[in-house]
């Protein structure tokens, strides 16, 4: 279950590598020619001015305020509560990404913690992302064997200070944010990509803008021809094997569809039809109430509502990565050149805007229950999205999309109007038939099978015998 109001294009807190020119001025190249041999050797080992080096970029949300940040991480309980024994976040699962400020007007915090996915975890939209827990506290870091052979999550702490402070070495640089970075088993079992900025799957700044949409219900698309019988009957209106009913070896003619349907509807009105669904795997045609009067059998969650900032993070500040000098003095921090100079990190809770939920729900309802079941000629393949070439496959049908403006021509002015396609296009109206829909759920993963007119299953053996 996902937040239906979440922006479909928001990324997870993530990292990526990007080539950048070094910071040295180009004029320094002339001085290198006159430098001593030792200095020249040092310069040869370091990146030359104008050369491009790969640096890590960060886009993340740090929601949890703590007491202070040291080389041990984020202190989450005050000294007064622990009588001088500081308690730091457990890197295997803290700070928990869903825990933040309890109210919108919290005072400004100076020590903030959060979690971020390493650049080695593939970027996916936050909507639909899932990573299975790997420890009893719900932490999701991938477990790696340590020197003793025990499995543990490889969580690394990354420290950040405002760029304006960290760029000047003469300042007393102090971390204001610590991000706990980890690799997770990233999956998207219930969604698929609907917009992809690039054909490559590599982590990059452009890939922050991916968008996802939910997988549609996986129904099989063929019309009912009374394959099998819903009710056991004593030969009054249908042909059956004599041994099962009247003990006479006689076969009567199969009634036409209208006679059969009338009998099914009669039984439906006087008994509990549902008990026979699984037994006989059969449908009664419910076209009129379920097609003309639309019920919801879609996910109702395909279109964005834009309740939150599109990036899912909102207002960010620019931070520079820093690192401890390693001499044990918590006051000694210096710039970390492995990170880019500008890392965008949001602090605290997200901003949110109120919208017309009823209007959005109605539009989503129409998109889920009408647009996604329209003929393929009205659909298109999203740019850069890999899709099966087989138009009868679930992958193809699931990933093709319709222009959302199409459902805006549906009219609802106190009466039941519908698009022409809703009335006369099959398999669009297949999933509106209660019995067909249920049978499709029973039969499984495929969405399309070729079919022909068939007689009830009990007659297959007789038909063969007569031949």
UniProtKB/Swiss-Prot annotation:
The Acidic residues compositionally biased stretches are 16-45
Task: Give the protein's biological function.
Answer: Major capsid protein that self-associates to form 240 hexon trimers, each in the shape of a hexagon, building most of the pseudo T=25 capsid. Assembled into trimeric units with the help of the chaperone shutoff protein. Transported by pre-protein VI to the nucleus where it associates with other structural proteins to form an empty capsid. Might be involved, through its interaction with host dyneins, in the intracellular microtubule-dependent transport of incoming viral capsid to the nucleus.
SUPFAM superfamilies named among the record's database cross-references? Group II dsDNA viruses VP
The UniProt subunit note reads as follows: Homotrimer. Interacts with the capsid vertex protein; this interaction binds the peripentonal hexons to the neighboring penton base. Interacts with the hexon-linking protein; this interaction tethers the hexons surrounding the penton to those situated in the central plate of the facet. Interacts with the hexon-interlacing protein; this interaction lashes the hexons together. Interacts with host dyneins DYNC1LI1 and DYNC1I2; this interaction might be involved in intracellular microtubule-dependent transport of incoming viral capsid.
UniProt cross-references to Gene3D superfamilies, sorted A to Z: Adenovirus Type 2 Hexon, domain 1, Hexon Major Viral Coat Protein, domain 2
This chain belongs to the protein called Hexon protein
InterPro entries assigned: Adenovirus_Pll_hexon_N, Adenovirus_Pll_hexon_sub2, VP_dsDNA_II
Expression triggers: Expressed in the late phase of the viral replicative cycle.
Per UniProt, subcellular location reads as: Virion; Host nucleus
């Amino acid at each position: 279950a996902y937040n239906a109001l979440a922006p479909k294009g928001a990324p997870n807190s993530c990292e990526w590598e990007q080539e950048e020119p070094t910071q040295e001025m180009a004029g320094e190249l002339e001085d290198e020619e006159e430098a001593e041999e030792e200095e020249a050797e040092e310069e040869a080992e370091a990146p030359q001015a104008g050369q491009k080096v790969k640096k890590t970029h960060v886009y993340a949300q740090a929601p949890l305020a703590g007491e202070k940040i040291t080389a041990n991480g984020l202190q989450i309980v005050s000294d007064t509560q622990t009588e001088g024994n500081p308690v730091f976040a457990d890197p295997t699962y803290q700070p928990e990404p869903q825990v933040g400020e309890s109210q919108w007007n919290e005072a400004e915090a100076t020590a903030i913690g959060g979690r971020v996915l390493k650049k080695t975890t593939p970027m996916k939209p936050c909507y639909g992302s899932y990573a299975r827990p790997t420890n009893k506290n719900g932490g999701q870091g991938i477990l790696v064997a340590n020197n003793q052979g025990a499995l543990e999550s490889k969580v690394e702490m990354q420290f950040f200070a405002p760029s304006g402070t960290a760029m000047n070495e003469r300042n007393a640089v102090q971390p204001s944010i610590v991000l706990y970075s980890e690799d997770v088993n990233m999956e998207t079992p219930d969604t698929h990509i609907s917009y992809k900025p690039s054909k490559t799957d590599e982590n990059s700044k452009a890939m922050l803008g991916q968008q996802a949409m939910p997988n549609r219900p996986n129904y099989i698309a063929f019309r009912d021809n009374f394959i099998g019988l819903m009710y056991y009957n004593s030969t009054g209106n249908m042909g059956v094997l004599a041994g099962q009913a009247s003990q006479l070896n006689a076969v009567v003619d199969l009634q036409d569809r209208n006679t059969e349907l009338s009998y099914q509807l009669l039984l439906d009105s006087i008994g509990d039809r549902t008990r026979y669904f699984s037994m006989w795997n059969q449908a009664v045609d419910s076209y009129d109430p379920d097609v003309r009067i639309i019920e919801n059998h879609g996910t109702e969650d395909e279109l964005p509502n834009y309740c939150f900032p599109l990036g899912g993070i909102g207002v960010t500040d620019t931070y520079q990565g820093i690192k401890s000098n390693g001499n044990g003095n918590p006051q000694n921090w210096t710039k970390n050149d492995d990170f880019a100079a500008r890392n965008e990190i949001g602090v605290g809770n997200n901003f949110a805007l109120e919208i017309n939920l009823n209007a959005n729900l109605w539009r989503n309802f129409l998109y889920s229950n009408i647009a996604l079941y329209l003929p393929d000629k009205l659909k298109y393949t999203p740019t850069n999205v890999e899709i099966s070439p087989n138009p009868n496959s679930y992958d193809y049908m699931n990933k093709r999309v319709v222009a959302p403006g199409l459902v805006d021509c549906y009219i609802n002015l106190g009466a039941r109007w519908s698009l022409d396609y809703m009335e006369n296009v099959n398999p669009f109206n297949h999933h509106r038939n209660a019995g067909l829909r249920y049978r499709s759920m029973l039969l499984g993963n495929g969405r399309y099978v070729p079919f022909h007119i068939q007689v009830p299953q009990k007659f297959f053996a007789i038909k063969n015998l007569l031949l």
